[in-house]
Amino acid sequence: MIRLNVFIRTTATNREETVATAKELVAASLKDAGCVAYDLFESATRPDVLMICETWSDAKALAAHETTSHFTTLVPRLNELGELKLEKFVI
């Protein structure tokens, strides 16, 4: 399995749209084949930080997810709204 922790740092101005966009990505991604988990967390200590935790069954499922229309549309939008940092783990 593969685990991705994606940290999103945004601004107060962009926060509402960032959360809405991330929620849209989560809802669509949960339907992708091989998605074990896909969750959005809002930091309790830093209002400018969100985290998406993704778990994929394997590299093939993750690669397929990265070609979906929701990924290719919403991830670039999240990049416009904030700064993304990705940590990838193999379970």
Regions found by a protein language model. Give the residues of each.
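Short amphipathic alpha-helical segments
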Residues: N14-V36, H70-T73
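Residue-level signal for well-ordered alpha-helical positions
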Residues: T21, F41, H65-T68, R77
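Acidic-histidine catalytic/liganding microenvironments
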Residues: D32-A33, R46, T68, L81
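Glycine-rich beta-strand-turn "strand-cap" elements at beta-sheet edges
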Residues: I2, L40-D48, T73-I91
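Short conserved AdoMet
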Residues: L30, S57, N79
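Short, well-ordered beta-strand segments in beta-rich or mixed alpha/beta enzyme
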Residues: I2-R9, D39-E66
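Generic alpha-helical hydrophobic packing signal
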Residues: F7-R9, A22-L25, L84, K88-V90
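Generic structural signal for secondary-structure transition and capping sites
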Residues: A27-L30, G34, A61, E83-L86
